[in-house]
């Protein structure tokens, strides 16, 4: 409630994304887009391949393989995002399909990051180069990575994450089961687990 409609919100999927640059750099890059909401993009049209032709037509830059909206990383002004997500999405609905359909209406100021200027979705050739996330297919240095996809995507995600941050592991010697879906680990308080 303390956020204004003019504030910028950055959304990243929780378990298969990580940042490779600062929030300041991401915010700076956001100001360079002509549209008010920016979504990551990917190679494959999922979950409904029948939308592929329509989705491709919406992109000015057709030169990259990343032509399809991916809802795993996006940013925009809060007021614009409120309008985009004004219609409720049921728990069993696909949020990516919802956003793709909203994008196709043309009613929202939305753009796909087809060059990976800010966001890169799973790309086997992406590497850490001179301390930054680099996509040789687009010659862009990006700010965030999303390892969306199957086992090979998760392997690439882990490899890139390790290149940027090294293996991070906090050894846990004991834990307490608080409920079916909550564990209390010795370096966390009970309040942190609720």
Give the location of each predicted region.
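Short acidic donor-binding/metal-coordinating loop in glycosyltransferase active sites
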Residues: 14-16
């Amino acid at each position: 409630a303390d956020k204004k409609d003019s504030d910028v919100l950055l959304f990243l999927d929780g378990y298969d994304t990580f940042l490779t640059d600062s929030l300041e750099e991401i915010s700076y890059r956001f100001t360079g887009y002509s549209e008010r909401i920016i979504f990551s993009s990917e190679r494959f049209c999922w979950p409904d391949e029948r939308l592929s032709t329509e989705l491709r037509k919406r992109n000015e830059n057709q030169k990259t393989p990343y032509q399809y909206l991916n809802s795993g990383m996006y940013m925009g002004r809060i007021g614009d995002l409120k309008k985009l997500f004004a219609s409720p999405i049921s728990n069993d609905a696909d949020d990516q399909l919802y956003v793709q359909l909203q994008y196709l209406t043309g009613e929202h100021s939305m753009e796909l990051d087809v060059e990976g200027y800010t966001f890169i979705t799973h790309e086997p050739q992406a590497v850490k180069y001179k301390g930054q996330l680099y996509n040789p297919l687009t010659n862009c240095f990006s700010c965030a990575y999303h390892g969306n996809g199957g086992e090979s995507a998760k392997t690439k995600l882990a490899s890139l994450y390790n290149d940027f941050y090294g293996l991070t592991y906090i050894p846990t010697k004991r834990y307490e089961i608080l409920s079916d879906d909550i564990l209390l680990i010795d370096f966390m308080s009970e309040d942190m687990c609720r």
